[in-house]
Amino acid sequence: MTRSVELPQYSVRLEIENASGQAGLEKQITQELQSRNFNDMQLTVVEASQFKIRKAAKSFIISREENGDAAEQLALRLGLDPSCVIYRELEQNSEHISATLVLGKDFLMSGRFPARGAKS
């Protein structure tokens, strides 16, 4: 008997930067993401940190890969508009990060994550 194993369509190694101004939000979001099951996406949070240089009003995703399909799919699953995804290469990317989620002040207020059980 041959068994087939379905691999996820998207694999995202995620860095989270908290630019919302609320200390610890990056840790809460990391825990939330790790408890989620995104059907066709393997999501690994590689790093999470507080962004100390400046605050961001709006959340966005930086695709670290030229093909931004996985980052756009992640945006949809997080309740963000895929147009918020920009591309910027990450130099010296030893962690093989494929996307960076920058949490802005809007993320805190909006309840961005779709409800559990909602199609993701």
Give residue spans per PLM region:
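Flexible, polar/acidic helix-loop-strand segments at domain edges
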Residues: E6-Q9, K105
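BRCT (BRCA1 C-terminal) domain core and associated BRCT-interaction motifs
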Residues: K27-Q28, E32, R36-M109
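Gram-negative outer-membrane assembly/targeting C-terminal domains
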Residues: M1, G104-S120
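C-terminal solvent-exposed extensions
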Residues: M1-E6, S94-E95
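Second-shell loop/turn segments in exported
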Residues: V12-A23, A56-R64
